[in-house]
Design a protein with these regions (language model features):
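P-loop NTP-binding core
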Residues: 1-271
Length: 271
């Protein structure tokens, strides 16, 4: 089986739009006919609940998978996958015990950064996903380090606000540190999120990010749109909940850009 392309939505700044981005990227890729495995790497479980998976994953979840990858001789990553109601979309959900994972990973001695990589390798032996899309927690901790080591591309959503652009240099350093271990890791791009171009600070914020990251900002920006919060409240992905909303269409456009960055051809949209 082929190894999937692993896309990780990351930013240590809380509320920058990681889970919203991951939730929409998954459906937009699935709409194009790709098989997608979403993995919720955040103990807040926001991505899992968006897909109605709040009650799932008591036994099968990312916490168990990472503990078992170390402990079970016949570890089979595919056993931790749950099916969703959405075509082409499967999941590994988060669990509240994920809070324990940071210390648990610290305590494991050998190959401390390779646990998530081993999980993906194990899944690739039996399953055929085109993409894995990770949502991550708002830290620069050991779990995120493991996820970066297992990734091909990091996609960084940045909230278009003063707080959103302040202190972003740290994620760049974190990326550089990780790429010493994972030479294959690339920055897929920066997504400006919650953009309101009528506000003058929006343009300033975009300039600040351009100065810091250069030309890796995606052309497509995600506007402030109440349908994002509404769909999350209703525990449904934005792209099926409000398929014609402004943000949904922007996430689709963004996904086309992501596909061109990762070198996969855009497929005919199946609606
Ligand atoms: N385009 C948008 N328009 C309006 N609200 C948005 C938009 N994108 C995200 N939000 C809202 O902003 C909040 C933060 O977004 P989200 O949960 O995706 O960020 P996050 O980076 O995953 O946060 P955390 O760091 O806590 O995991 C949520 O309440 C979400 O509904
Ligand atoms: Mg989140």
């Amino acid at each position: 089986m082929a190894k999937p392309t692993v896309l990780t939505c990351a930013n240590h700044k809380g509320g920058s739009g990681k889970s919203s981005l991951a939730g929409s990227l998954i459906i937009a890729l699935a709409e194009q006919g790709y098989r997608v495995l979403g993995i919720d790497g955040d103990m807040q479980r926001n991505l899992s609940t968006t897909y109605g998976l709040r009650e799932f994953g008591k036994e099968k979840n990312l916490y168990r998978a990472i503990e078992d990858v170390d402990e079970l001789e016949n570890f089979n990553g595919a056993e931790y996958i749950v099916k969703t109601d959405y075509e082409n979309v499967d999941f590994i959900v988060s669990h509240e015990d994920m809070a324990l994972l940071e210390t648990s990973l610290m305590l494991k001695m050998a190959e401390r950064e390779k646990y998530v990589s081993k999980l993906i390798e194990s899944i690739s032996e039996t399953e055929n996903y085109d993409f894995v899309v990770f949502d991550t927690n708002p830290t620069l901790g050991v779990l995120n380090f493991n996820i970066f080591v297992a990734s091909d591309y990091v996609i960084i959503p940045v909230e278009c606000s003063a707080y959103g652009v302040d202190g972003l240099g740290a994620i760049l350093k974190f990326y550089k540190n990780t790429s010493r271990v994972n030479k294959n890791l690339k920055i897929g791009g920066i997504v400006m999120s919650k953009v309101d171009l009528r506000k003058s600070i929006a343009k300033d914020a975009i300039e600040v990010v351009k100065d810091m990251f250069g030309d890796v900002i995606f052309d497509t920006m995600i506007s402030t749109d109440t349908s994002v919060e509404k769909s999350q409240w209703d525990e449904e992905p934005l792209l099926t909940h409000s398929p014609d909303s402004r943000a949904a269409n922007q996430y689709r456009e963004l996904t086309k850009e992501v596909l061109s960055v990762v070198g996969k051809k855009e497929r005919i949209v199946q609606k």
